[in-house]
Amino acid sequence: MLQNLFEQIDTADNLLKITIFHLPADNEEYIRNLCQLKESVKEFFGSNAPLTAYVAQPCVTASMAAEVTYIPEGVEYERHDGYTLLHGDGFCELITQGITPTTPSAGIRQQSEEIFSQLSKMLAKHGFAICDIYRQWNYIEQITTIHNERQNYQEFNDARSRFYNNADWSNGYPAATGIGTSCGGVMIEVFAIRGTNVVNHAIDNPVQVAAHNYSQKVLTGKTDEAQRTTPKFERARIVGDVVYISGTAAIKGENSLQLDNATAQTEETMNIIKSLTATDNIPTECTATEYTLLRTYIKNSDEAAEVIKFMDERYPSVPKHYLIADVCRPELLIEIEGTAIIR
């Protein structure tokens, strides 16, 4: 199956990353598939082998799907084990593979701390600070499950907060997604950038409380911290001419909207994203924003067809990807992330 998928990909030298979405049976199969993916990529692409990430989420429209990223024209690059460095005019960027723990059956906090330790070493080796991270994906097995009064997502948030405590976030946190997977433990992907010749700003949403300012009442589970720590991310970031839209759900202020079906939540979520990406909300001069990708996570597979119908009718020309995944609050049925270009 991987061979057939790879044959559909342009094998140009500037291939940066392949993210595979597929549902394995369990953690053992996930580990086997991940090893096979890395070996197959090296065999098929040779010296131009891209970074890889394997997300344990089923696709709605196929048994396996891939998102493929290319290095922009004119950007020099260095391939390393587990990450790639991009060098442009006045900036350096670090793109990671999907970083996984050695033991995906360990506790969520232990896995998260191990991954953040790996990430810290990658960044430090090339002079990046933790606060240079501008986009982060956090895939968390059984994200809303509670073990011994501790919610998996809150365990991750506490580990992330401790990692982030070592950095100066005066320019805002990364854009981020925290989403559930069926298995595979914790997996994190990161984009980081440093340099003076680049636009890089946080974007707030006028209709939402910043996630890092949430009150204790919307956080779940027991914690070892003095209090439960908040999810440390911004609603979006603009880097260059690209707006990176964080995982967004039907939340106004800090409270989930009481909408009992996925299509209604999808419509409200896209209205919230419109507020976020409105030209008068972008902290740099622009006359228009244009979506270039919308990735939709759907909690219940039996609601997928209606969600797809809604999105395809409203956004027919935008590339879209539909996945089945649990969202960070039990009452939320949809989460949408994406990218947009400013004009």
Task: Please annotate each region the language model reported.
Residues M1-W137, Q142-R343:
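N-terminal presequence-like segments and the immediate start of the first folded domain
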